[in-house]
Amino acid sequence: QRIKVGGWKEEVWYCYYSIGRAYNLLFTSDNMRNSNYIFHAVHYWMEAYNYYPDRIENLYEIVKLYREQGKYNLAYQFYLMADYQRKHHYSDDHLFHAKSIYDYKLDYELSIMAFYVDVKPTDIHKNIYRLLSNNVIDDTIFNNILSNYKFYTPRLRDLDKGEHPQNKIQDVCREFVKTNPGFSMSTPSIAMTEAGELAMNVRYVNYKINEKGEYINKDKIISRNVMYVLDQQGENLRTSFNVQHDAQYDGLYVGLEDIKLIDNDGHLTYICNRGIQPNKIQVEYGLIEASGVCSSRLLELEHQHPIEKNWVLFKNKNNSSLQFIYNWCPLQIGTFLDKSETNDTRTHNSFISEKHNTPRLFQRVRGSTNGIVVDNELWFVCHVVSYENRRQYYHIFVVLDPENEYKLKKYSQLFTFEKEHVEYTTGFVYNTNKKKFVIGYSTNDNTTNFVDISKEDVDNMFIG
């Protein structure tokens, strides 16, 4: 009756929209047996579009309906109609305006069905990053988006130029494994030394990850680390030695986990995770001498958590001091206390000195590599984990601006190295002359791999 009377366009449109929703509710409450309900629902939603095409809530309902029925091509065509209206006729001055549909729910539908229809990769990546950066999306939808992204994520291995020491290092790793039964080669960390040589730490572990993603541990979880140094051409192994650690903290966890290397004025410096007790992990920081001996200390923050890991180092270009990234949302930058040179009475030996805001996605970002300078910018590789039946690791390039208090400058789309579930990197280097990156990584904690990728290819992965 209200439709027949006419009058205010918003009310008439809302009547069409509501009748469609009522038929859809009948369809779902009838256990989806009577398809006539769906026919009537779509009919009234289309009448709403014909009457007032500027609004898209009705089109969204059709998109969602067909997507849930697996009719992805139909759903996508109605998505395109809704997206066009949203871009060209958007207004929030509507009766009962459903802001969430315009802001993210329509895009969320595309993130689910894009795998089945002809969507340009650049379009789906932009769509997903709008969603992942939206601060009002609830955790359930956010987690679903992250889970679905595995179907769209690029594989960095496909861009590999092959100019890296993978074969040479894998050969020496296999020799280590032969003489140390029960150990597997794992994540390499790499850093360019002041002398222009490539320093590389390879971690060897005594546990396995099975096909279900479960860790198969022995009585003790042991990490052994071997340092390899290649010449300036990266072709010949100049030296290698075992990294020796402070054994006083060995227990269930033995050794240094996830060493991340950085050259600090000719001193090979590292930061790593150190299992102290079954439910206590701290971060260790120190130097690796040419003899393999480490001088180290456990880092302590005021009010730190029982489990601390994934801190990463960088060199502050303004004062040449090493600092660390503690957290990514907000971006928290830490400073070391040198108590030997001060009268500081604090019991901790590091503190958070700066904080900067970052997008929603960075709540999930964790540090992987130490920072390196690339064209006057500070670059990191970080990781994001989607917690599913099997964990899914993604990676992301993050760039900070040294000229603006090390605030976030830009970041890339998420990527994988080989689309394996568990992938990890702890180091990368940049060749200024060749304008390329070499990144070391592992898959499922039982490989030692490298990828060589041009800066141009990486630049094409950045958002915006």
Feature locations, PLM:
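Beta-rich carbohydrate-recognition and catalytic domains
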Residues: 157-183, 192-251, 263-363, 373-421, ...
